């Protein structure tokens, strides 16, 4: 990674930053580290971008309605795909169809968080 430039955070626009941040903090087992009425930040429990770890996720209040499929999404690789999908559904995610069933050998499950932001749960680690 460049010492001159690093990714600080991935930003997700949403209507209710706290609600969406709470979902993702529970889903990823991260913690909320900053919070106000406009934005909420979650971080990995044992590291931060400042320590050269993965970026934070920033949930930013945005009044605009979601229009179409996300241009960027997270792919999650679990130990057990079926168990993880069930756990995420219990947290408030839903399975969605965005055309993935057109592929004969689909190995991922497309889901949406409580505000409809898409993400994928990949097949289990080999």
Spans of features found by a protein language model:
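Core segments of cupin and vicinal oxygen chelate
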Residues: 2-4, 11-55, 84, 90, ...
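Vicinal oxygen chelate
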Residues: 7-16, 44, 62-88, 107-112
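Short phosphate-binding/catalytic loops that engage adenosine nucleotides
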Residues: 93
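A short acidic/small-residue loop/turn micro-motif
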Residues: 103, 125-126
């Amino acid at each position: 990674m460049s010492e001159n430039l690093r990714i600080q955070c991935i930003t997700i626009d949403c209507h209710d930053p706290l609600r969406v941040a709470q979902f993702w903090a529970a889903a990823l087992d991260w913690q909320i580290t900053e919070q106000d009425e406009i934005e909420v930040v979650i971080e990995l429990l044992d590291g931060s971008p400042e320590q050269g770890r993965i970026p934070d996720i920033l949930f930013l209040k945005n009044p605009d309605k979601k229009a179409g499929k996300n241009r960027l999404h997270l792919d999650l690789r679990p130990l057990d795909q079926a168990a993880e999908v069930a756990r995420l559904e219990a947290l408030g995610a839903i399975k969605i169809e965005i055309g993935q069933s057109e592929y004969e050998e689909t190995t991922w499950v497309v889901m949406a968080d409580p505000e409809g932001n898409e993400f994928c749960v990949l097949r289990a680690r080999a």
